[in-house]
Amino acid sequence: MTAHRRHPAAIAILLLLGLVVVGGAYSLLAPKTAEASAVSADSVADGRALFLANCATCHGLAGQGTKAGPSLVGVGAASVDFQVGTGRMPLAGPSVQAAPQDPIKFTPEQIASMAAYVASLAPGPAIPDSQYTTGKDGNVALGGELFRVNCAMCHNFAGAGGALTRGKYAPSLQGVAGKDVYEAMITGPQSMPVFNDANISPEGKNSIIAWLKTTQAEQNVGGMTLGNLGPVSEGLFVWVFGLGLMIGCAVWLGQKSA
């Protein structure tokens, strides 16, 4: 038998041929991925143009922050979607706290583009999946427990909001969209702490949203709610009106018997 020697370049040719076949097959079977990348690049470019025109004055040309506004590097798309999507940004004027404004100054497409640009600066919280922002399939009992432990101290036990220090306040959560509640938890706007997935899981956040929607849909069986502000407002009401009424009655009875 005669031994056949392989050409030294045979292995290299086989590897090159294999790469060509695999690369060609991938390009044929995954055209949508390439299209998605192109759209994403266009979205980032559009977002940068919007950012430079509307945000760079306060946040810097590269989002690095200035004396007039904080850095946006690492805040993620969720922060932009929350702040701009609720009308808190652009800031209407100098104030202690940004308040939601209506109407919103940008379209959903423009907000998505700006969010994509800010997300490209550095990793940060992404816009949440819709399956965790509707409250559907959430555990209402668990949501109520999580809310009382983590949120009620500022937002009140009924989500009616409350006063904070230095002129700030915790806004009411009544009628707030589930996505806004979720994004606030993962971005921590203003004085609010951040509740990432290690603190409260996505399922837990969805349960909180379910609890908020359930309490808001409950029918009031009667009585004065006093703004649902809890024992402080109730105590003030008793002291001012209740005690005042008692003093008035005492004075009236004293004059009558005199």
Language model segments and positions:
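Cytosolic-side transmembrane helix boundary signature
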Residues: 1-8
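C-terminal capping alpha-helices of c-type cytochrome domains
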Residues: 8-31, 103-129, 196-257
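Ser/Thr/Pro/Gly-rich low-complexity linker/stalk segments immediately outside membranes or between
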Residues: 30-43
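Periplasmic/extracellular electron-transfer cofactor-ligation site
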Residues: 40-44, 48-74, 82, 86-92, ...
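Extracytoplasmic electron-transfer domains, predominantly the class I c-type cytochrome c fold
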Residues: 73-122, 164-220
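Generic secondary-structure boundary signal with a strong preference for alpha-helix termini
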Residues: 98-99, 155, 254
